[in-house]
């Protein structure tokens, strides 16, 4: 791995550490310091959800695309994707307490191949529509995703598998609630 790639990965980690929800909260003068997508959905502020989601996706997507045009190897690009997700999940600017990394991971993995992005999104939507559980959709998609990557772009399988392990780890509390039958379906949040 080149020195440039390592420096670029550190830069990407720092970029990933910028919390979109906190920045948007400050720009919109909201009191809630953590405008996460699920929190905003519960409050009915759908435009903010879209803005936070797009910013989180771009945190993962832009560094990978730029790295591709800078001539990074496939392995280095995979590590850049991992760095973006690590920054979002364990941000240095917020005492290493961040989000779950789903949108950032999607953004980081999507540039690999449109087939991977479509398969990932299709799997997530299918499971979500049948179950109503966001966490279940995310975890199952994260478990299947390395196989999609292996099928379309096998050279990215290892770094993407690491990102998927992070996603499953960040959802461990949701997995426990699902197991106990205590996880809320997304529809129940709208009924409140």
Curated annotation (Swiss-Prot):
Q: Return the Pfam families for the record.
A: G3P_acyltransf
Any one cellular component term from GO for this entry?
plasma membrane
What EC number(s) would the UniProt record show? 2.3.1.275
Top enzyme class: transferase
Record's keyword terms, sorted: Cell inner membrane, Cell membrane, Lipid biosynthesis, Lipid metabolism, Membrane, Phospholipid biosynthesis, Phospholipid metabolism, Transferase, Transmembrane, Transmembrane helix
- Primary localisation category: membrane
Instruction: From the record, give the transmembrane residue ranges.
Output: 4-24, 48-68, 74-94, 101-121, 125-145
Please provide the Gene Ontology terms (biological process) for this protein: phospholipid biosynthetic process
- Keyword S-adenosyl-L-methionine assigned: no
Pathways involved: Lipid metabolism; phospholipid metabolism
Subunit text: Probably interacts with PlsX.
Name of the protein described by the UniProt record: Glycerol-3-phosphate acyltransferase
Encoded by which gene?
Answer: plsY
């Amino acid at each position: 791995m080149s020195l440039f790639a390592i420096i670029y990965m550190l830069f990407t980690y720092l970029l990933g550490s910028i919390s979109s929800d906190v920045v948007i909260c400050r720009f919109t003068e909201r009191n809630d310091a953590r405008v996460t997508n699920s929190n905003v959905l519960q409050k009915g502020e759908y435009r903010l959800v879209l803005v936070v989601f797009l910013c989180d996706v771009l945190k993962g997507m832009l560094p990978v695309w730029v790295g591709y045009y800078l001539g990074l190897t496939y392995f280095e690009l995979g590590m850049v994707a991992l760095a973006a997700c690590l920054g979002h999940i364990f941000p240095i600017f917020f005492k290493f307490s961040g989000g779950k990394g789903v949108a950032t991971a999607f953004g980081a993995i999507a540039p690999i191949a449109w087939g991977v992005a479509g398969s990932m999104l299709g799997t997530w939507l299918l499971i979500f529509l049948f179950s109503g559980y966001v966490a279940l959709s995310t975890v199952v998609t994260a478990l299947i995703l390395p196989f999609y990557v292996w099928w379309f772009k096998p050279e990215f399988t290892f770094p993407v598998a690491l990102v998927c392990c992070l996603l499953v780890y960040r959802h461990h509390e949701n997995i426990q609630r699902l197991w106990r039958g205590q996880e809320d379906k997304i529809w129940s949040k709208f009924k409140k």
